[in-house]
């Protein structure tokens, strides 16, 4: 079946035609070492590279190869949150309303595209999706735009959400067969979330999966009424992962709305705060698992669902793992959503236990109150959107974590409060890089950061290395097996995306963003 599905995908995509700079669909399934063709490197979300020319033995010889500062003009002040894509020696990355193509060897600009935005939240953009000779990206004012790779000229644009309802768009599109998968953002008004599939040729809508069910549909029993569902939230602002053999997209959904005051939405509020498996061809829900039922702490469960095959109790299983914002680590059978492991990866205090499905049970005592409730983790979460990594070589799941507390309080006790209906104030926090054993859920090692906590993307490689950022604006390399610090470079600003690596002309490059600048590192001078 896997072979048949791959052949069908190849048949469709061959009709697109592949020019000299184009992306072959095979690289999305098993990327070559000279590319980073999609948001997580491949469909799995592992952010693991088989490259090892840069390794634990020679890391101290790493040098700066080039620097590229993105200067979009105007009042845009956003950091580079996008993961750069590398295809045939060209790197593509985004800021809100902007796309650049640069030489991946030198950092020289090839072209720069600017979208004339009509508004929207310019908080960040997580990148582009590419297939064939076509690039796709989302804009803050709710459009999906397609460009040609060679010159950056616009092919088409399509509206994917309603700016007047305070939606905006920031996710990196994912291409699965003949589907461009796009999500939406927005917490300022009580609006429902959804995921869409768009045609690569025209941008026309193929299907839409709504996070909130309709009255009478499965999941509607977890809401008090139709009005609560119609305003229920659950944004889809981080890219999905994809299993081509099962033809399932794996999506983490955001928090319900109103965000803090949950009095008017009693129940678990499906399918917000869920890991959802969705058929890529039909948009139908195959299964779901809910890390944070009835969330009232803004703990979006959008963290990357990482896919890998592993051994559990002596048997090979198709697995999915997520280090969720609520402080809990989950391993699921990705064929059916059944729970395999549930464990804390930071100490939390918001649950009263774990139910038979492996889902944490919220403690009523930790619900936001008029006089406040002290809750761990804080609103920023034990993890956030920043991508984790999984190494098949070590069997460890790597995630930047934060242990922190917030006092959550409501200021509007009405069932239909104004805005979020409450807020939080954070206090003590500590940050750390953690390696989790997927077989047990235990933290194998933890590397604590000095100073304040923070969230940073992660990359692991066959060179026995893990790359990430720290609160002191350093780009850091750790030993993948022990967590020992091996190397760092101060970038002058915090790491703002997930690092990537690729090899061109025999040289392995590492690229990371800090603020508005891309930094490329390599072993120079034949070292």
Tell where the protein language model's regions lie, with residue ranges.
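Extracytoplasmic/lumenal domain signature
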Residues: 57-71, 99-120, 131, 143-164, ...
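Repeat-blade elements of multi-bladed beta-propeller folds
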Residues: 36-40, 78-97, 120-144, 168-192, ...
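Non-catalytic accessory segments flanking enzyme active sites
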Residues: 44-69, 73, 83
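Extracellular/periplasmic catalytic domains that process cell-envelope and extracellular macromolecules
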Residues: 28-31, 57-58, 103-105, 242-244, ...
């Amino acid at each position: 079946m896997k072979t048949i599905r791959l052949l069908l995908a190849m048949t469709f995509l061959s009709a697109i035609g592949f020019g000299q700079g184009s992306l072959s669909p095979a690289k999305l399934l098993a990327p070559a070492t000279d590319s980073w063709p999609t948001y997580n490197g491949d469909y799995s979300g592992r952010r693991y590279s088989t490259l090892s020319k840069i390794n634990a033995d020679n890391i101290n010889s790493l040098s700066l190869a080039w620097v590229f500062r993105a200067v979009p003009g105007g009042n845009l002040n956003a950091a580079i949150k996008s993961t750069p894509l590398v295809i045939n020696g060209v790197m593509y990355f985004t800021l809100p309303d902007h796309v650049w193509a640069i030489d991946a060897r030198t950092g020289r600009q090839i072209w720069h595209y600017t979208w004339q935005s009509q508004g929207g939240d310019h908080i960040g953009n997580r990148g582009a999706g590419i297939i064939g000779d076509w690039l796709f990206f989302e804009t803050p004012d709710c459009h999906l735009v397609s460009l040609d790779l060679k010159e950056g000229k616009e092919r088409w644009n399509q509206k994917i959400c309603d700016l007047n309802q305070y939606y905006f768009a920031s996710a990196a599109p994912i291409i699965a067969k003949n589907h461009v998968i796009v999500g939406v953002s927005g917490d300022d008004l009580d609006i429902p979330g959804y995921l869409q599939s768009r045609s690569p040729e025209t941008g026309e809508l193929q299907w839409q999966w709504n996070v909130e069910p309709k009255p009478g549909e499965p999941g509607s029993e977890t809401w008090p009424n139709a009005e609560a569902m119609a305003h229920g939230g659950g944004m889809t602002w981080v890219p999905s992962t994809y299993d081509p053999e099962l033809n399932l997209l794996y999506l983490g959904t955001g928090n319900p709305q109103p965000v803090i005051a949950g009095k008017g939405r009693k129940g678990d509020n499906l399918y917000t705060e869920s890991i959802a498996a969705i058929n890529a061809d039909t948009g139908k829900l195959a299964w779901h698992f809910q890390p944070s039922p009835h969330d009232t702490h803004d703990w979006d469960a959008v963290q990357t669902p990482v896919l890998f095959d592993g051994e559990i109790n002596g048997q090979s299983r198709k697995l999915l793992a997520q280090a969720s914002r609520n402080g809990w680590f989950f391993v699921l059978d990705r064929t059916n959503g059944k729970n395999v492991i549930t464990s804390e990866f930071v100490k939390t205090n918001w649950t009263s236990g774990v139910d038979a499905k492996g889902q944490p049970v919220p403690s009523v005592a930790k619900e936001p109150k008029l006089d406040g409730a002290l809750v761990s983790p804080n609103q920023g979460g034990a993890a956030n959107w920043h991508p984790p990594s999984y190494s098949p070589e070590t069997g460890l799941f790597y995630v930047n974590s934060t242990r922190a507390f917030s006092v959550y309080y409501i200021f509007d006790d009405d069932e239909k409060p104004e805005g979020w209906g409450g807020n939080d104030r954070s206090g003590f926090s500590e940050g750390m890089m953690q390696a989790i054993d997927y077989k047990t859920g235990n933290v194998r090692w933890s590397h604590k950061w000095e100073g304040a906590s923070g969230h940073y993307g992660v990359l692991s490689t066959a060179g026995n290395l893990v790359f990430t950022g720290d609160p002191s604006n350093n780009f850091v390399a750790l030993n993948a097996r022990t967590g020992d610090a091996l190397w760092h470079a101060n970038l002058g600003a915090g790491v703002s995306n997930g690092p990537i690596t690729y090899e061109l002309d025999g040289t392995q490059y590492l690229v990371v963003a800090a603020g508005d600048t891309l930094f490329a590192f390599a072993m120079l001078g034949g070292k």
